[in-house]
């Protein structure tokens, strides 16, 4: 069984985990089936929530921090809490807005989580360890594609990237985590600024924020958008509201976070991505290689006999030999 603390939201306080010396990792669910999830939760739960339940069960995850990002994740918390299997299960309430009052409340909730982390890890908060985890990812330079929408995970990102010659920027709800730096300090002094930094990120769709605040997800170098939705998602499934403002080519795709999407259903997804790449003149070189030169002097004849139960064919070269 894994002792790693897992998380499923960009508002999860990773720097706080690091401050307590915890090992942590993002959930990246891709379910083989939903048999476990549908036994203990409703079948109409969104695919991502069901895939989270499957990963927790199949991987033996026993430490998990969730947020109240949507009703589906609240149900995931309820199911896991009722199972009695979790060693460390925390639900972090995340405000829908960033105001002085919500930031103060969020700091108090972070303090409660910090106390739980101290009990679980047996370590004191180390401000330098927390500060060392503030990492800023360099932004893509030059023309690129932007992957927007709901969580897609590593398999979806790789699938999209393989279809395009251009770099793909993951700006999905779990792919665009970036915090302003917070100076190292004692826990009580660290948490107010840290709460503000977490809530100051580019807002996801569940946050009460104007569309203009999300505009920075798509910069002037974006040539096209792949907008990902998950079946039954509360926030990203209803429609293409955000991407329409950018006046860029948009491809909308939907998955259910199952492996079947990329196997038996993967042909349709690949075909749509390939067609979109072709429309943007961004087909990878492996698909743009010139065909071998034809021998125009060669002459062949073909005969085809098609019946009700079978079809036979024969090809002869110019000397009459069967090829």
Regions found by a protein language model. Name each.
Residues 1-300:
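An N-terminal assembly and electron-transfer interface module characteristic of large anaerobic redox
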Residues 301-305:
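Short glycine-aspartate micro-motif
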Residues 306-323:
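Short glycine-rich, Thr/Ser-proximal phosphate-binding strand/loop in the N-terminal lobe
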